[in-house]
């Protein structure tokens, strides 16, 4: 990959995972600048089928693909092999679709120390009926599908009781896609004795310009960097 580091010192590393748009965009660029300027290696990636990644036919009625978890695991493994990565300080970040994929990937992989999630669905059983009610394009459950081989039992609220990683859950008070109660359900199920935080951004929504990162940049920067340097 085309990148350059100031030196060969090992640094904490953050892997950033997009939402269901799936490819590297302006959000990742802005976030990469923020964390790189504060001493982190930053890794972004395209899902297969997006950007410069391999072709992969997708049905837009599917909320996700199991291959996305395979891709995430491959990125984590590649990061672990890099000589400038502090292997004890690998964090992951994701929002929306990327949020639940990020928590599952962190849960599955011993190399990940913690994760930062924003706009996180608690489970498909919670999210799909809710999305049917609020989706601007009038989606039905027939248009909100999950692959048969996707590990549904590893969705955030279901793995939370056994989750032993650092976790920062961010949610906008006005998020109508993954409302506050979903993040509260995940947070309340987490075990005691781990570094965990639920952060509510007043006036923020789910994504786009309403994403918490855009609503309060300074708070986002302070909280997320503080979380990873705890």
Sequence positions of predicted segments:
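Short beta-strand/loop motif that positions the catalytic acidic residue
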Residues: 163, 169-171, 175
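Short alpha-helix in the alpha/beta-hydrolase fold that links the catalytic acid
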Residues: 165, 179-188
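The serine-hydrolase catalytic nucleophile loop
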Residues: 20-33, 47, 181
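Short beta-strand element of the alpha/beta-hydrolase
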Residues: 10-19
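Hydrolase active-site cap/lid region
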Residues: 104-149, 162-163
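Conserved alpha/beta-hydrolase
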Residues: 35-55
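C-terminal catalytic histidine-bearing segment of alpha/beta-hydrolase fold enzymes
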Residues: 192-230
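Catalytic nucleophile-loop/oxyanion-hole region of alpha/beta-hydrolase
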Residues: 24, 50-82
């Amino acid at each position: 990959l085309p990148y350059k580091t100031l030196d060969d010192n090992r640094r904490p590393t953050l892997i950033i995972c997009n939402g269901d748009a799936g490819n590297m965009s302006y959000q990742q660029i802005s976030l990469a600048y923020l964390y790189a300027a504060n001493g982190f290696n930053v890794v972004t990636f395209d899902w297969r089928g997006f950007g410069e990644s391999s072709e992969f036919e997708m049905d837009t009625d599917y909320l996700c693909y199991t291959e996305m978890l395979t891709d995430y695991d491959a990125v984590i493994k590649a990061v672990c092999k890099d000589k400038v990565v502090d292997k004890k300080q690998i964090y992951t970040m994701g929002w929306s679709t990327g949020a639940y994929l990020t928590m599952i990937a962190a849960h599955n992989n011993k190399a990940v120390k913690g994760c930062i999630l924003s706009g996180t669905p608690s489970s498909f059983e919670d999210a799909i009926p809710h999305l049917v009610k609020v989706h601007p394009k009038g989606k039905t459950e027939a248009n909100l599908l999950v692959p048969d081989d996707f590990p549904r039992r590893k969705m955030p609220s279901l793995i939370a009781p056994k989750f032993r990683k650092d976790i920062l859950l961010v949610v906008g008070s006005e998020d109508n896609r993954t409302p506050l109660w979903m993040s509260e359900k995940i947070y309340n199920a987490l075990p005691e004795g781990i570094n965990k935080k639920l952060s509510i951004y007043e006036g923020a929504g789910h994504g786009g310009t309403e994403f918490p990162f855009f609503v309060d940049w300074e708070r986002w920067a302070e909280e997320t960097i503080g979380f990873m340097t705890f």
